[in-house]
């Protein structure tokens, strides 16, 4: 039976997510940006939280853990490399590990760059990728702890997933990401189409996610750093994809 996924807006622009297994009743929260909205969503659905799957240690992704764990006595799954930064963890995971949420299975991908401990969760049976702050729609996370080559390799790992996977990212940044991407690839038809879609979604007060990875591969300039026309557009023709990516990220940082 397919999982039920709910998007839960938290804080200013964070996305919380609940993924529920109807067959067992198990429910996981992907990160815990803020307890109150997640509790309200759980109570609305009549679900009990059994697990919190943490992607990285930043406060806007773990701030609700203590309250949720106290209320639901749920298991906290965290990156192995987070160590003491996520003290409430009951299980620490690394690349290739599989986390079970009732009958659902999430495969762990290590995706460092934004932070060194960052992981993503792939629910293959439900074609769902929870990438938090590694990959955004039409964007990617800032590189705070890792290096640009490290982040590029993480993006390549996610780009290798099938086109029909749906991306669930950590923040609603898509409109600003589109604005930047159009300065690099103004003639990209897929990006132009996504820009119109995003304008309609935000105008109606709807989230811009999920979006398929297939769409992102065509429209997200940060996933296209190895495309010659992208390198040429920023004066980096002939440079390595990692260097092109780094220049794109620097430009976005300063935009």
From Swiss-Prot:
Zn(2+) 1 binds at residues 56, 58, 114, 133. Keywords: Hydrolase, Metal-binding, Zinc. Gene3D superfamilies: Ribonuclease Z/Hydroxyacylglutathione hydrolase-like (3.60.15.10). Pfam families: HAGH_C, Lactamase_B. GO terms for molecular function: hydroxyacylglutathione hydrolase activity; metal ion binding. The keyword Metal-binding applies. Binds 2 Zn(2+) ions per subunit. Pathway: Secondary metabolite metabolism; methylglyoxal degradation; (R)-lactate from methylglyoxal: step 2/2. The keyword Zinc applies. One of its GO terms (biological process) is methylglyoxal catabolic process to D-lactate via S-lactoyl-glutathione. Transmembrane segments: none annotated. It catalyses: an S-(2-hydroxyacyl)glutathione + H2O = a 2-hydroxy carboxylate + glutathione + H(+). InterPro entries: Clx_II_MBL (IPR035680), Glyoxalase_II_hydrolase (IPR050110), HAGH_C (IPR032282), Hydroxyacylglutathione_Hdrlase (IPR017782), Metallo-B-lactamas (IPR001279), RibonucZ/Hydroxyglut_hydro (IPR036866). Its cofactor is Zn(2+). Zn(2+) 2 binds at residues 60-61, 133, 171. Its EC number is 3.1.2.6. Thiolesterase that catalyzes the hydrolysis of S-D-lactoyl-glutathione to form glutathione and D-lactic acid. Belongs to the metallo-beta-lactamase superfamily. Glyoxalase II family. Monomer. This is Hydroxyacylglutathione hydrolase. The lineage of its organism: Bacteria, Pseudomonadati, Pseudomonadota, Alphaproteobacteria, Hyphomicrobiales. The gene is gloB.
């Amino acid at each position: 039976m397919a999982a039920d996924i709910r998007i839960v807006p938290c804080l200013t622009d964070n996305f919380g997510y609940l993924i529920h297994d109807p067959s067992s009743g198990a429910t996981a929260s992907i990160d815990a940006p803020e307890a109150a909205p997640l509790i309200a969503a759980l109570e609305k659905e009549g679900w009990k939280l059994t697990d919190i799957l943490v992607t990285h240690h930043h406060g806007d992704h773990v701030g609700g853990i203590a309250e949720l764990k106290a209320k639901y006595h749920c298991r906290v799954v965290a990156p192995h490399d987070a160590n003491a930064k996520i003290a409430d963890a009951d299980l620490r995971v690394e690349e290739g590990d599989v986390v079970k949420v009732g009958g659902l299975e999430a495969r762990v991908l290590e995706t460092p760059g934004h932070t060194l401990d960052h992981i993503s969760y792939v629910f293959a049976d439900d074609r769902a990728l929870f990438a938090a702050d590694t990959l955004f729609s039409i964007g990617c996370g800032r590189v705070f702890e890792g290096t640009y080559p490290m982040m590029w390799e993480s993006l390549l790992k996610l780009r290798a997933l099938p086109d029909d996977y749906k991306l669930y990212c950590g923040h609603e940044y898509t409109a600003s990401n589109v604005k930047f991407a159009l300065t690099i690839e103004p003639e990209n038809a897929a990006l132009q189409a996504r820009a119109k879609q995003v304008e309609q979604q935000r105008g109606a007060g709807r989230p811009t996610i999920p979006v398929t990875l297939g769409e992102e591969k065509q429209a997200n300039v940060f996933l296209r750093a190895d495309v010659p026309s992208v390198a040429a557009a920023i004066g980096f023709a002939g440079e390595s994809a990692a260097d092109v990516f780094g220049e794109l990220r620097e430009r976005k940082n300063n935009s």
